[in-house]
Structures are given as C-alpha cells and as structure tokens.
C-alpha cells in the first residue's frame, strides 16, 4: 500500500509565525513587516480582541489589520511573548536600516560617500552599496542580496508549514493572523521551505515505512505523528487512478482561476501565475481546476509580478517537484520595495530560474516567450520586477498582461510596432485596487498621508485604458481575468464586488467593446477551456 497527501489538505507556508509570502523571505523586508505591521497588529489585538472580532464580522473590513482568531487570545499572547527574544535580531536589522536611511545618508549632499562605509551599522557593513542619484545630491543604497541571505539575519528556523483540512472553496484572509495550531485538526511542522522533505510530501506514493520515516524526519512522534499520517490516504494503483484533466497530449489553453492559466503546445506545458484550489470536500464549485488536474510535469512556470495573488508560496511549494524552469521579470533595484524574484525563488527551492528583461525573447520548447513592459499597479514605486508575458504558440500569440495599467497611452502602440498583432489578450481589470500602503506601507521610510496614499492605489486598467491596449494590439479574443472572483482567493485578497463596482462596470464595457468590433470577449470565472 502506498500513500499520498489528501486533496483536501492545505499545507500553508509560515515565516516568523505569519502566512508566508515573498516579502517575508528576504530578512531585510521581513524585519520591516514584523516591526511596522505584525507587532502592531498583535499588540492591538492583545489590548482589545473584541475590536478585532467586531471588525472581521464586517465584510468591508476584511483585508485590514485584524486578527481572525479572537477566541484564541491566550495562545496568541503566549506565542508572542515566547518569540520576543527571537525577534530581537530582526529588530537589530530594522534599526540598522533605519539609521542608514534617517541618520547617515541624509548628512551627505554630493561629497564623496566613501566615509559612509565606515559608519555603517554592523548589520549592514559589507552588505550594501551606497551611491547618489543623478541629481548628485540624494544619497541612496541597495542591498547585496546574496550576502543578506548568507547573513545571520536570514534564519530558516523561522520557517514552518501548517497542515490543515480545507472544507470549502472560500478561504479566510490569512495575512494578518498568526499561523498557530488553532485546533486538533491542524499541525505546525518546523521545516525550511526549500526542504526536499516537502517535495516528498507533495509527490506522494509513499510506503507506510516511508511515511513513518517522513514523520520522524519532521520531528514528529506519538499523537503528532498520527495526526500527520491522517493527512494521507491510500494511492490508487496506476491502472485505477483517474487521469488528470490536463494529461491529454492535445494542445490546450485553459483558464483555471484568477490569473492562473495552463497551456500545452506540442507536448510542452506552461503555467502562468499559479494559484490553484483544493478538492476532496463536498460543496466545491463544479468543474473547477484543482491540484489533482495538473500534469506530472510543468515545463515552464511564468510569474508576472511580486504580489501575493500572482506569486503564492502555498501553490508554488506544492508544485515545485513538477516544475522545470521558472521565468520571472528581472529586478535591478535590490531595494526594500523591489527584492529580486530570482533570489526569492532560489531560496524557496527552485533551481532553474531565469530573469527576463523587457522585450527579451526566450525559446521554451515548442513556443517562444517575450517579456513585455508592465506599467502601473505598484503605487508609483520604483519596482522593476513586473512583466506581461507574450507566448507565441506557433502561429498563435497570447498575452498575459496581468494587472498592467495603460497609464502611458502610446506605449502599447509602440510595443505593437515591435511584436505585431496579438491573437489573444488576458488582462486584469481590478480598476480600483487597494491603497499602495496595503502592501508596501511597512517598507516606507515614513508613512504617506491618507490623501497621497489613496491617490496611489494598486489599480489595474479601467475601461478606457484597457480599450487602448486592445485597439493597439488588435486581438481576436480578449479575456478579463485576475479579478479575485474565485472564493479561494480570499486567502490573500479582500475584494467585494457587486454589479455597480467600477471593476465590474469597466470590464463589462470592455467585453461589449470587443464584441461590437466582431471579436470574442468574456470576463472569466472559475474555469474556461479556450482554443489554442
């Protein structure tokens, strides 16, 4: 008898006690989130958990700084007090960056910066470069990111996973609640997120002895080992197992939820912005694409940008053992707001990661991939690591524009002059996004005033902007996606649409615009098989 992980078991990444995502992996950004956001959330909660309880009961408050576990105050307080000594090292790194930004660099206005290296706090000495901007007066810096990962501040013992059953499609918002064991059905395991042990969990096909050995290597025994074993089920023999929905060798283009699209072309497989749902529980949406539908091999994994709903660690870890090469946009900043995606993914256990620059072309098996410029949706911050992926499947070209915003009206006209017409366009139209501080606030040197923050929202394209993209690229098919409509996206998003919401109005207008011109258009939801 062999055993594999049940399809209804989530394995959630945990970093420093919080739901793991990309800005929590580099130590310099983790320190900012812990100091500027997480500590404040916990202390507010401990002061008055009923305020948090009242907030999370209101749908419009989801996504705010509220803990979704008001009945577990004692457990959260105990965890917070016990981990305080471990947070001291992150506090040290936070203070070092604060001193550099607020005390050291502002004293220099054009003269040689060599003396700065002698002033650097120990946490940053030998790990940053300082320089001037082109005005020759504003001093700035960048991290030497590999040295930050090699430092004592990058501590893999902060990393865990939490096993728990999923009972419905809808997921509770996870980014503001400590990831503890809140019930006997949950299990926290100490393990680096890049550990091959996790690949063994997700690959499955384990004998009983191998399953016992895996529990032991996770440091589990007794009741905890038995709980771990309960997350696995007998694996059907190969002749009895149902074939995954994507196991056919036919060419296919399949939307599978939010911004995730699966494609197969002449035997080469692609997955864009992977976020997948679970299965194995009653009441789930019919015909949704789940982990069980994936092929054994994903030749090329493409990520458009570094937001939680496009680069979800929870999905990435579960499919890592299937993935060949990962394509990501190039980052050139090495700053707090723009850590390198390549470095993050390599520390997450991916070995073949390629960083691609604007309009660079790569051969990917039977297809060709081009990285297109991506403007907007990042709060007007200097963030380079974002791209739209154009994939040429033989004679047919498909653009995954993600949340690109057409704030430079002539750019797509100029792009079209280089790449030619595009057959199919996927475009996100969350035209009223969160304020920039919702993601980036903990990374700021000083907080934005509310008026400025609200003016720099993480917006996708509205109707006029999306229309100009479509008119410039002349596609036959246009699909609105990446709207957060699927219930499982609630784990990292907090959208609440009705028919009057600007995103729904804008996307309806775009669909009609394309259809009026004789094209095919649709706002996608859950799953859709398309021609390739």
Curated annotation (Swiss-Prot):
A single GO BP annotation from the record?
antibiotic biosynthetic process
Write down how the cofactor binds this protein.
Contains a dinuclear iron cluster that becomes oxo-bridged (Fe-O-Fe) during O(2) activation.
- Give the GO molecular function terms: metal ion binding; oxidoreductase activity
- Source taxon at top rank: Bacteria
Q: Which residues form the signal peptide?
A: none
Q: Where are the transmembrane segments?
A: none
| Subunit note | Homodimer.
Protein name, UniProt field? 4-amino-L-phenylalanyl-[CmlP-peptidyl-carrier-protein] 3-hydroxylase
The gene name on file is cmlA
